[in-house]
Amino acid sequence: TATLYPINARRWFNAEVDACWFTLTIDPALPQGNYTIDVHENLFEGAGKIARRWGVVGTTLVSDLDAYQLVRSADGPSPYTWRSGLKHDAARVFEFTSFPENLESEYIYPLLKGTDVFRGRHQHPSRWVLVPQHKFGEDTTHLQYTAPKVWRYLIGHAAALDNRKSMIYRNRPRFSVFGHGDYTFAPLKVSCSGMHKESRFQLVTQAKTPRGTRPVVLDDTCYFLPFENSTHAALVTAILRSPECQAFIQSLVFWDAKRPITKKLLSHIDLFALPCDRPTIRATAAAIAADAGVRFDANEATELF
């Protein structure tokens, strides 16, 4: 058996760290396979009260075993593939606070960061990003002919770009970015921030730019599902926002992690297996679509969910 008692490290050690008192009882007479930890509220006040139980179910680490059992039926492979946002490690080069009129617009997209998604600023992007590749690993030398202004701009910042520290840029075409593909440019995305202490899902649509309507690109602090169909996108957003889905996420997530929401966690959610009230979900989806200004087909939604 195991127990964990959180300790207020600031109070007792004047340290800005997480701390705990962890006990483990090893007894060969106890039945095997009990991989659970009783997590108490505090080492001193309320020490006798168990706040929740951590444990391993199959191969999954669960942060609240009791809550997990109520929605365990939804723990299965996601019917959709979750994607990460764009990574470039050079914000001063690739990102802009106003539309860069001096660069070819084909490579300029509205940009949302995780904080924008979390704060509900997803309908009005205020940043722009230069995406020099439309597919991962795509050659970039053609830009000197197809987008000479973009090429000259990148050459002007070559020192910063060529010296990015991450290994992912090594042995790649010059000025490469990472975490992009056809899904990056999907017209609709159901997104959330991976960095915040609450899971908030937003329906991201295309945005108007000085050069016409463009897909919105999400940065690498976000996770998202790409969609072409607005009814499907609104319905999935409604399911992810449902109390049942939020309870499932709460049962798995460890909010004190640097990135509490992960692709691995999201990929555990079998959206269509959640015990939701389906008429309520469809009504919520219709409202989400109306707020986003996109089409919603009630009959199509009923067929899907």
Identify what each model region corresponds to:
Residues 201-238:
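A short beta-sheet element
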